[in-house]
Curated annotation (Swiss-Prot):
PROSITE patterns, alphabetized: ZF_RING_2 (PS50089)
Function: E3 ubiquitin-protein ligase involved in the regulation of organ and seed size. Probably functions to restrict cell proliferation during organ and seed development.
Name recorded for this polypeptide: E3 ubiquitin-protein ligase DA2L
Enzyme Commission code: 2.3.2.27
Catalytic activity: S-ubiquitinyl-[E2 ubiquitin-conjugating enzyme]-L-cysteine + [acceptor protein]-L-lysine = [E2 ubiquitin-conjugating enzyme]-L-cysteine + N(6)-ubiquitinyl-[acceptor protein]-L-lysine
The species this protein was found in: Arabidopsis thaliana
Length: 335
């Protein structure tokens, strides 16, 4: 009666009641209080830690903070993780005003208890728990890798679809721009004036021969008065006696004809074929004198025929009029 079942108190050597390893240089530790807690089996003794597990001691435990092996360790009340006494004193400072969190599960009011060495059941249970934790970490890692691959695949698909859409849009825009450029070029070409004279089916320039002959006659009539003024009648008679009769020179008429053709071609280049033909017709009509001056015009025409015959051109004017009084045809022959 009155007997109480309990764990037998472990006898601890006094030298293990204070830090032996010297891992942390802390002056805030109360050595007397620490000794009392160790002797009351509330904290694990401060055994010296080993860096490697000897082959003769397979029951040593590793501290997850300092990675040293000890005969026994403290256990956190929140997550049952092992920790040595020196690491616990470093984590839970007695002069700290804020509550200490568990270094493993981040639970506030971190506290530990000492249960002695682990039994076989506890060790096997810990191994199972560790295996579960490892498997969970592996699954989480695989899930992260799969998520990354899926995200990358979606990104590639979206990029390919957007690139194809942009390429189609660029092709459409390029085609429309090319069509617009072609339309602009064609409109500009149509707006530009033609710098080439109009050519007939026979490969000849479409000039009005009557206008050319009239211009040639005018040019010749302008040249004759100057020659007559500079030459006296005696000189002319003496020159006629000395010179033999010869065919009239065609250099002067041909030169005048070339000048007339050049002038008319230049006018056609500047104002266009249609407008130039109209202007030449108007000029030819203006050059024709009225009925009061027919005698003077006939004299000029006879002179022009004389010089054109010397150049090898036979010009015959045969005008035919229709009922309305308009001119219908003209004849020009070449010898």
């Amino acid at each position: 009666m009155g007997n109480k079942l309990g764990r037998k108190r472990q006898i601890v050597d006094e030298r293990y009641t204070k830090p032996q390893q010297g891992l942390y240089m802390s002056k805030d530790v109360d050595i007397k209080k620490l000794k009392k807690l160790i002797l009351e089996s509330k904290l694990a003794p401060c055994y010296p830690g080993l860096e490697e597990t000897p082959s003769s001691h397979h029951d040593l435990e590793e501290c997850p903070i300092c990675f040293l092996y000890y005969p026994s360790l403290n256990r956190s009340r929140c997550c049952m993780k092992s920790i040595c006494t020196e690491c616990f004193l470093r984590m839970k400072s007695p002069n700290s005003a804020q509550p200490t969190q568990c270094p493993f599960c981040k639970t506030s009011n971190y506290a530990v208890e000492y249960r002695g060495g682990k039994t076989k059941e506890e060790k096997s249970f810990e191994q199972i728990e560790e295996q579960r934790v490892i498997e969970a970490k592996i699954r989480m890692r695989q899930k992260e890798v799969e998520d990354d691959e899926e995200r990358m695949q979606k990104r590639l698909e979206s990029y390919s679809s957007s690139s194809s859409t942009s390429a189609a849009t660029l092709d459409t825009e390029y085609g429309s721009a090319a069509e617009d450029d072609e339309e602009i070029v064609s409109s500009q070409e149509s707006c530009l004036p033609s710098h080439h004279p109009q050519v007939t089916r026979d490969g000849q320039f479409d000039f009005d021969l009557e206008d050319i002959m009239v211009m040639e006659a005018i040019w010749l009539s302008m040249q004759e008065p100057g020659i007559q003024r500079n030459t006296s009648p005696d000189d002319i008679s003496e020159k006629d006696r000395n010179e033999e009769p010869s065919t009239p020179s065609s250099s002067s008429p041909s030169g005048g004809l070339a000048c007339a053709i050049a002038v008319l071609a230049e006018r056609q280049q500047m104002v266009g074929v249609s407008s130039s033909n109209q202007n030449v017709n108007l000029a030819s009509q203006n050059l024709v004198p009225d009925n009061g001056n027919n005698s003077h015009y006939n004299a000029i025409e006879q002179d022009s025929n004389h010089y054109l015959q010397g150049a090898g051109i036979s010009y015959t004017r045969s005008d035919m009029t229709d009922d309305s009084g308009g001119e219908t045809s003209r004849e020009v022959t070449w010898q």
